Amino acid sequence: MEARNAEGLESCIEKIQEVKLSSFAELKAFRERKVALITGITGQDGSYLAELLLSKGYKVHGIIRRSSSFNTARIEHLYGNPVTHNGSASFSLHYGDMTDSSCLIKLISTIEPTEIYHLAAQSHVKVSFDLPEYTAEVDAVGTLRLLDAIHACRLTEKVRFYQASTSELYGKVQEIPQSELTPFYPRSPYAVAKMYGYWIVVNYREAYKMFACNGILFNHESPRRGETFVTRKITRSVAKISLRQQEHIELGNLSALRDWGHAKEYVEAMWRILQQDTPDDFVIATGKQFSVREFCNLAFAEIGEQLVWEGEGVDEVGKNQDGVVRVKVSPKYYRPTEVETLLGNPAKARKTLGWEPKITVPELVKEMVASDIALMEADPMA
């Protein structure tokens, strides 16, 4: 009897091991497909990430919103490239929206991505004060819809999920620099919505054992940055001034301090986060800080103008060496609640991911100004 029981137990153990090996082999085969789904693919980060993933042999799917005008300028070179957009469908676009859970479920069940990069958001801080409900609907609840779509499609244990979080979570900073352990103190509807997004990712990771991660990205720029963001607004205006298409620029808080990096390097960090053995959250930053005023100095220096600053607050102006006012301050560009300083501590990303930024802020500014000058020369109305 004991021998029979021992044989039965041994057989049972062997079957369990076979199931485990079978499940492991199935998961390995699933991940080796290298299929990525990117929300927000038409944005700055989405376009750079698509380029990176295609270069690594991924099949890339992107979600775009239906609109009356095309908003695909940043990815046209990929969509129109026969190497990336061909019969094997290395690069595909799908209509969808973060406010429509049914379309998200349909896309995920059809595509069965191995990795999802959630970059879509209403990401303009000042606009979030004008559109607080919409910002919450897209940035907060939209993230929940996407996570729940993965769960509904029974892909919880297969898909790896990246959520684009933000340094705006720190808002009224509780310590300098800010790390993964720094308490959050959001100061805008955008930041509050992203805080929900952050914690719902953590919740799904803990509740369903999902490989879900947050990348707390500090400000990152490039020539593809949206025109309403302060860095791009500065470099576009400098380009127009150099071509005598504009006299000066109006800005808000010149003393605001930010940790700026290059978007191309930051999407590399996103990818590395999803290649780890265990899911975790990471601060992605340079660890260096510049003011908006200093960014202006660097940008104008690229066209041979050295700024001298006079006055304080809304009366402050920046004049070039000939005494011509190039920068003015306007109260309309101040936020109802300002975030005065943001400085990230990327030590964890450096140690765990092996990621470290190389492009400096002066190099970034140089690239952005040169790009905008070329753009304005080709089309003064751009």
From Swiss-Prot:
Recorded hits in InterPro entries, A to Z, give:
GDP_Man_deHydtase (IPR006368), NAD(P)-bd_dom (IPR016040), NAD(P)-bd_dom_sf (IPR036291)
Q: Kindly state which keywords UniProt assigns to this record, in alphabetical order.
A: Lyase, NADP
Show the GO MF annotations. Answer: GDP-mannose 4,6-dehydratase activity
Enzyme class name = lyase
One of the GO BP terms on file: GDP-L-fucose biosynthetic process
* Superkingdom per UniProt: Eukaryota
E.C. code: 4.2.1.47
Q: In which pathway does it act?
A: Nucleotide-sugar biosynthesis; GDP-L-fucose biosynthesis via de novo pathway; GDP-L-fucose from GDP-alpha-D-mannose: step 1/2
Question: Which residues of the sequence carry a binding annotation for NADP(+)?
Answer: 40-45, 97-98, 119-123, 134, 194, 220, 225
List, alphabetically, the CDD domains matched. Answer: GDP_MD_SDR_e
What temperature-related properties of activity are listed for this protein?
Optimum temperature is 16-23 degrees Celsius.
Per the Swiss-Prot or TrEMBL record, the active site comprises: 166, 168 (nucleophile), 190 (nucleophile)
Q: Which cofactor does it need?
A: NADP(+)
Reaction catalysis annotation = GDP-alpha-D-mannose = GDP-4-dehydro-alpha-D-rhamnose + H2O
Functional description taken from the UniProt entry: Catalyzes the conversion of GDP-D-mannose to GDP-4-dehydro-6-deoxy-D-mannose.
Q: Which family does it belong to?
A: Belongs to the NAD(P)-dependent epimerase/dehydratase family. GDP-mannose 4,6-dehydratase subfamily.
PANTHER family in the cross-refs: GDP-MANNOSE 4,6 DEHYDRATASE, GDP-MANNOSE 4,6-DEHYDRATASE
Q: What is this protein called?
A: GDP-mannose 4,6 dehydratase 2
Organism listed in the record: Caenorhabditis elegans
The gene that this protein is the product of is gmd-2
